[in-house]
């Protein structure tokens, strides 16, 4: 089963709810997932379906409600329902009402709304609509809550709300659709399962409010960063990531395409300033620990700039033959393998900081870049890109001015991305009323190796005459 296109066990997915919110879920076998007021479902019921499908939670009367068995279950226990494809339900209704006429294709939500309003009268204008407030709705809040506790489907609840609305027929078709969509966001019990890509994870963090955690990143700025850095599957890249592992996830996804069994040998070397690297968000990446350990290596700034020498490592520890190591017992064996892990880590640091040159430098950090980038660039191969992301333009301007005067860097440029999303409704097109402003800035340049300055003939003659004069002066002293 392809985990990139098919829903499978033991993977993280992102669930889109009717309220346009998102929820990250880990699909463990034989467990249930609670979506709050939208219901709960069994994980086994959605396994094997492709990503992007919309499911509906429904109840056929066999489930135990929250009012029953109060002694064995808590009062707020959400009943677990069954799952069916929402598109399949709409398709069945369309087959029953098919009259042979072709209509333009609509989305699943538009189809469901159009079906609900097909048998309801509407007004051409809002001229006869009187704003009565809550008096226009005959159903009380208690009656609606009772229907929800009885586990009625969202369609039944919304139909009763529409029939009980005194002035619903005086609304225009567009106003009726907006009204139904608002009710669906409250009472609908459907959800969409999508693959948890790096872009979806970034959007989830932005919607959640963790903008400072991701340093005001946007999907557009990350896409431009990956293109400017020329990220490839066989490359070895130096990275500084202060977003909790999100930037590393973007790099891994561009290098390996989410394939957990990729044969590519590319690596990401993460430099961190603390005792341990913060790569917490990689737990959502659906990569195995073995894969991450093979392709992601971490090293502190101190070890990168001042690595241990070979003599220091060999003087502190010498590995034993395998037979002698196996013969150790008790605490000596544990102490030996702990020192062996330290020994292997020190050797890895030597390999990463030796004469090896990297294929690019990608940074998203709050450290002082004008002093840090020139030092890290010494480990970057010639004709390779350097891309630095920053929340503010001023920090990157200072970096660009520093690199302008350094012949090792070619054409430092500061870039900014702006994406203005539009909402498209049938017959209408306009920008979103609320949107995230900005997405950070990028500083991009190339690491080059300056050629030695050519020596002119006049300079050569002057040097030779100076040497002859010095030689004559020495003879006179003798």
Curated annotation (Swiss-Prot):
Pfam families from the UniProt entry: Gcd10p (PF04189)
Compartments reported by the entry: Nucleus
Keyword Magnesium included in the entry's annotation: no
Any GO CC annotation of this UniProt entry: tRNA (m1A) methyltransferase complex
Region described as Disordered: spans on this chain: 456-478
GO biological process: tRNA methylation
GO molecular function per UniProt: RNA binding
Translocase recorded as keyword: no
InterPro entries: TRM6
Keywords: Nucleus, Repressor, RNA-binding, tRNA processing
Biased composition annotated in UniProt, kind: Basic and acidic residues: 464-478
Subunit structure: Heterotetramer; composed of two copies of TRM6/GCD10 and two copies of TRM61/GCD14.
Similarity comment: Belongs to the TRM6/GCD10 family.
Record's function text: Substrate-binding subunit of tRNA (adenine-N(1)-)-methyltransferase, which catalyzes the formation of N(1)-methyladenine at position 58 (m1A58) in initiator methionyl-tRNA. Also required for repression of GCN4 mRNA translation by the upstream open reading frames (uORFs) under conditions of amino acid sufficiency.
Any further remark recorded for this protein: Present with 2580 molecules/cell in log phase SD medium.
Full protein name: tRNA (adenine(58)-N(1))-methyltransferase non-catalytic subunit TRM6
Organism annotation: Saccharomyces cerevisiae (strain ATCC 204508 / S288c) (Baker's yeast)
